[in-house]
Amino acid sequence: MKSLFAADIRDNQAVDAMFLVAAKTHGVTKTGNSYLTLKLIDRTGDIEARVWERADDIGRGFDKNDFVRVRGQATLYQGKMQLRVQDVMRVDESKIAPEDFLPKSAFDPQAMLEELQTILRGMKNPHLLALAEACFADEELMRLLRQAPGAKTIHHPYLSGLLEHTLSLMKLIQKVVENYQGVDVDLLLMGGFLHDIGKVYEFTFDRAVDYTDAGQLLGHLVMEVEMVTKKIEAIAAFPTELALLLKHLLVSHHGAYEFGSPKLPQTVEAVILHSLDDLDGKIQAIQNMPEKEPGSKWTAFHRAYGRSFYRIKTEEP
């Protein structure tokens, strides 16, 4: 069993532990020497590792997605923990406990799915209700939804993260619509449910979280529109305009062309969905960022957001 985890590694600590190699890249220094940069992960997070000596020899002994035993020294570099590696050895899978290596949601996936289904079964629109039930009846889709990560890196990047994010978004929708008149709540809830459903096919997550070929070539927006279109076509008399408005929610929810949406939000429901999706993703990412250093009130620098964040310490009731 694994005894030392990435989140527990401290500055100047000697490390001898098992990890999953999530990324492996080869580089050359200015003096012409080879080195390796590794992303090592376990269920608590990841740590960057560098192999400066014997990089070619060591690198031939393992590949990306291998389980490995790593020996090295931890150092704090620019606010992030890093390993200077002395040796890497591939480990046979029979010696591995898979639950040690992929992080997962703190919440029970079956309980989250049941809460999500309860919310959607409260919809009054019979066509959207039929679409929801068609999705629930798809056992493979539900199996993947219970397991899929919310993203590869930015927010909810762990098993069942997609379901956690989707449920959180739908609960936010329920609260926000109370403040506005004229919003199609059922359409918005269904959009919240389906907005990232294509990620169950975009990612592979049997070891590290990575993209499938379809995820690389198409992306989840295209894949989920295709999936939803097929399910709608199997429902008798599903209104054409309703299908159009629902698919608009899916393709516009990233909110901007530069973030991958082919269309900007052009309905009130689309604006709400994009805004709440963005909010939930950012809050989760910020709350789960590592400290700049142990005990610091500041997080490490977040490259996607271009800043560090100050954490206010709240008193427990």
For each feature predicted by the language model, list its residue ranges.
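OB-fold single-stranded nucleic acid-binding module
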Residues: 24-34, 45-48, 54-102
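Divalent metal-dependent catalytic cores for phosphoryl transfer on phosphate-bearing substrates
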Residues: 153-155, 164-165, 175-293
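Divalent metal-coordination and catalytic microenvironments
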Residues: 19, 65, 169, 277
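OB-fold nucleic-acid-binding modules
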Residues: 1-15
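A short mid-domain helix/strand-loop element embedded in enzyme catalytic domains
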Residues: 128-172, 194-198
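Short, acidic/hydrophobic/Gly-rich beta-strand patch recurrent on exposed beta strands
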Residues: 37-42
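N-terminal intrinsically disordered, cationic/polar leader segments
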Residues: 274, 281, 291-317
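Extended, charge-rich, solvent-exposed interface segments
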Residues: 82-147, 223
